[in-house]
Amino acid sequence: MRPVFVGNFEYETRQSDLERLFDKYGRVDRVDMKSGYAFVYFEDERDAEDAIRKLDNFPFGYEKRRLSVEWAKGERGRPRGDAKAPSNLKPTKTLFVINFDPIRTKEHDIEKHFEPYGKVTNVRIRRNFSFVQFETQEDATKALEATQRSKILDRVVSVEYALKDDDERDDRNGGRSPRRSLSPVYRRRPSPDYGRRPSPGQGRRPSPDYGRARSPEYDRYKGPAAYERRRSPDYGRRSSDYGRQRSPGYDRYRSRSPVPRGRP
């Protein structure tokens, strides 16, 4: 079964997104998600050829990136379930894991899945993929070979070496621990993902709502000074009103007081 290579899609693209796209051209056996690319396996190669013709350079995703769709070269002819690591990736202590259920799967589930093969020093989940760091590269290699195409919570996962070790990032961040040095990356990367989709409405909506309660006062009365001037007369009027409210009753009381003095 010859796989179809798919590249240049957005980083947050999920396996189900590609399955829905390619299923229009024939029955898809499976989709293997990698780091920034994927392999799509059709049951019929004629359907795969049709998908390549129709989807190569096709605008896809929120950013309308042009997909790169062609017959896979390095993976062509590889039997299903082969756990061999991609030849173009340098072995590292950190593994890239994808295809697990992003809603149900937690960090402790992934750690429990990989810890039989060596000491796991760090696990980080980023949306629909994860990084698993081992104490040694040998343990990472052993885990990769043992867990490729294995299941985490009934989902078959794809495992490969990460492009760079966490230790290399630590060096750039002053030698801090993996969890600390990588946490800023975690905060930076999801932010564009989170803000990119809702931005047409969300980016504009909060500021008018936030400023609406105050801005009319400043707009109508020409700035803060005028706003304060507007408040001062109100305060004065309230004071005079208070005096006027008391004076009628007070006067009536005084008007009645002379009556007893006028009795014989």
UniProtKB/Swiss-Prot annotation:
Region annotation Disordered: where it falls in the sequence: 166-264
This protein's record includes keyword Phosphoprotein: yes
Gene3D superfamilies: 3.30.70.330
Compartments where located: Nucleus speckle; Nucleus, Nucleoplasm
PROSITE patterns: RRM
Domain of life per record: Eukaryota
Mutant phenotype after disruption: No visible phenotype under normal growth conditions.
Domain named RRM: residues: 2-74, 93-164
Biased composition (Basic and acidic residues): 211-254
Principal localisation: nucleus
GO terms, biological process: mRNA splicing, via spliceosome; RNA splicing
Record flagged with keyword Cell inner membrane: no
Keywords associated with the record: mRNA processing, mRNA splicing, Nucleus, Phosphoprotein, Repeat, RNA-binding, Spliceosome
Cellular component terms (Gene Ontology): nuclear speck; spliceosomal complex
Phosphoserine sites (modified residues): 181, 183, 199, 215, 232, 239, 247, 255
Pfam families found in the cross-reference section: RRM_1
Tissue distribution of the protein: Highly expressed in roots and flowers. A presumably longer alternatively spliced form is found in leaves, stems and flowers.
Family stated for the protein in its record: Belongs to the splicing factor SR family. RS subfamily.
Function of the molecule: Required for constitutive and alternative pre-mRNA splicing.
Protein name: Serine/arginine-rich splicing factor RS31
Species annotation: Arabidopsis thaliana (Mouse-ear cress)
Lineage of the organism: Eukaryota, Viridiplantae, Streptophyta, Embryophyta, Tracheophyta
